[in-house]
């Protein structure tokens, strides 16, 4: 059973998040990776998050670029820890995603790591 759930909004995010998956594997931590967009597949995101605890997931790592809604949407559906990984997917180099993730409103907590591959690796280490 996976202890960590990793969710990304697009298949194009997979290469960066391979650092997360490899780091978790190296630590002997089982993880699952799913692709579901907060903008294009919000219902799929909700269903995945709501079933996470039943699958054994204890923490969720959510990666997103641009408006980076995914980590906050995930956190709105669960009380388990959510770590947001901002990705550099726009002309702003990930600063937009970073600001979106660190500015969650009260009651929707998301921990935030560095932009890109360094953050992806650190999310696994947390």
What are these regions (language model features)?
Residues 1, 52-54, 75-77, 101-106, ...:
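Solvent-exposed alpha-helices and their adjacent loops that cap or buttress functional pockets
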Residues 2-40:
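Glycine-rich phosphate/diphosphate-binding loop of Rossmann-like nucleotide-binding domains
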Residues 3, 81-86, 108-109:
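Proline-centered loop/turn at the N-terminus of a beta-strand
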Residues 8, 35, 64, 85-88, ...:
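Short beta->alpha connector loops at strand-helix junctions that form conserved
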Residues 13-18, 41-45, 64-73, 92-95, ...:
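Short glycine/serine/threonine-rich phosphate/pyrophosphate-binding segments
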Residues 32-55:
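N-terminal beta-loop-helix "entrance" segment that forms/cooperates
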Residues 48-90:
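Glycine-rich phosphate-binding loop
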Residues 90-126:
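Short, glycine-/small-residue-rich phosphate/pyrophosphate-handling segment
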